[in-house]
Each structure stands twice: as structure tokens, then as C-alpha cells.
Amino acid sequence: MDAVTLSMDYDHPGCRPVLRRIRVQSPFIYGLTNYVAATLSANVLLAVGAAPAIGAAPGWPSGFGGQAGAMWVNAAGLINCTAHDMLTAVDAANAAHVPWVLDPVAMGAGVGEYDTIIRTLAARGPAVVRGNASEIMALAGGAATARGVETTASIAQAVPMGQELACSKKMIVAISGPEDHILGPDGQHIIVPGGHRLLTCVTGAGCALGGLVAAVLATLSMESDRLVAVAAVHALYARAAEIAARDASGPASFATGFVDALSRLQNADTLGTDA
């Protein structure tokens, strides 16, 4: 793909064939995330047809890290597991050539020791880094600060630094916002429009997206297919949010409807019908 900016939504012809692989292959996805987001993350993965295992029970990081089809590491998982657990899982994944996703939650919020751990993880070669504008800017070495886990930076500020990070580290950088920006290691840039503001009112929605990115990575045999695949799962997420918002009376009903919408979209697409 040339270094140009493209747009991709759920109706793009390249989207659904990628997503179908998750339902058909049902990949085993291992995740280290925080207890706040674990349930939603697991439900999102189950809804699209993946098989998740989440947590750092004895032996899991070293075992599942190398056995999974893909893995995601949510830095806020340090609430309930250790840096050693995360590094062990990442090293096991790298040794087995298992692709993994890093979500640098709250990077740049002013907690130096925490940020140092994230930088150590990032140096171990994730296939994808996914975060909000402030997190990506901070990881790229910028001066952006976050308000806890919330972004205080704009997408416009983050994209140039995210692109530099993607190119210098030869990985994909996904920046979530009112529209999502997927940045490739050779200067590629895919914009994913859509979604709904209620996603920002559901705890763990961004964290669960990291798991979904891992799920699609697990289905790919070629690294060159990753950029479009990452954009495709963001497009699925956006469309499911739009569907869920139609009948939602608030954040709680939206969260339930969102998981249902993911399942309907995936099942309908696999069966060749409309959701």
C-alpha cells in the first residue's frame, strides 16, 4: 500500500472478508488487562467468535503467551498483575512469533514509574500499539499529558507523532478518537469514520478494542495484511456502536446492545445475510 491517506468503513469491500476469518478460525487470544475491563473484553471477543483467556494465573504468562494465536497487553493490567507477568508473557510471545498488541493506558498522565514500564514493554516489539491521542503522543516522546486515563490531546496533534512512531519502530499505531486513525510502518494512513459518543461512557470499551485487534492479527499469515485488518476491526467496532446507540436509553443499555451488535454483525456476515 502506498503512503497515502485512505478511508475505510464497515461497508468497504476489504472489511468483511477480514472479519469473517475471526468467526471461522475462532483464534485463542490471551490478554493481560485490568479487572475493570476484563468482563467487557472477554464478551467482545466471544461475540466476534474468538476464544479468550484473560489474567496472570500461575504459569499463564509463560504458557499462554507462547500458545495463543495473538495476545494483547493492557498496561492498566498492572492494577492486578505485575510487570514481571507482562514481560514474561511478551517474551514468550516473541519467542513463539506470536503477534501482540500494546495498549499504553494512561501513558503520559504524570506517573513516571508506570510510564517506564510501558516504555520497556514497547521496546519489546508489539505488532500494534493502540491508544488515545495523549497516550500515543506520550509514547512517541511528546509532551502531551493525560487526565488519568482520558485524553487531553487532539487527533490532529497526535497523528504526526504517531506516524513517526509507526515508521521508526516498524509497527502499526492505532489512535482512537471521534474518528480512528490507523498508521502503518511505511507511511500508510487509514481513517475509520463512525462510532458513537456513548463508547466513551462505557468503562473498558477502548481496552476491549485492543483484544479485538489481537483477534484479527491471529488470523493472518502475512504481516503485509495487518494494516487493513486493524482498520477493519475498528470499522466493525464503529458500526456496532452506531447500531447499539439507536435503541439505547443510556450507557448501560448501550453496553449490552453493543456486544449484541458485534455478535449480530459477525454472524450475519459469516452467513452472508444482513445484520
Question: How would you label these PLM feature ranges?
Answer:
Residues 1-54:
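Glycine-rich phosphate/adenosyl-contacting loop at the front of the ribokinase-like
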Residues 10-14, 238-275:
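Charged C-terminal helix
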Residues 44-96:
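Active-site cofactor/substrate anionic-group-binding motifs, chiefly glycine-
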Residues 74, 82-131:
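Glycine/small-residue-rich loop that forms an oxyanion/phosphate-binding "nest" at active or ligand-binding sites
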Residues 111-189:
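Conserved phosphate/ATP/ADP-binding segment of small-molecule kinases
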Residues 138, 203-235:
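Short, small-residue alpha-helix embedded
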Residues 159, 163, 190-204:
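Short pre-catalytic strand/loop immediately N-terminal to key active-site residues, enriched for Gly-Thr
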Residues 161-166, 224-240, 258-259:
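Short, well-structured alpha-helical segments that form the helix of a local strand-helix-strand
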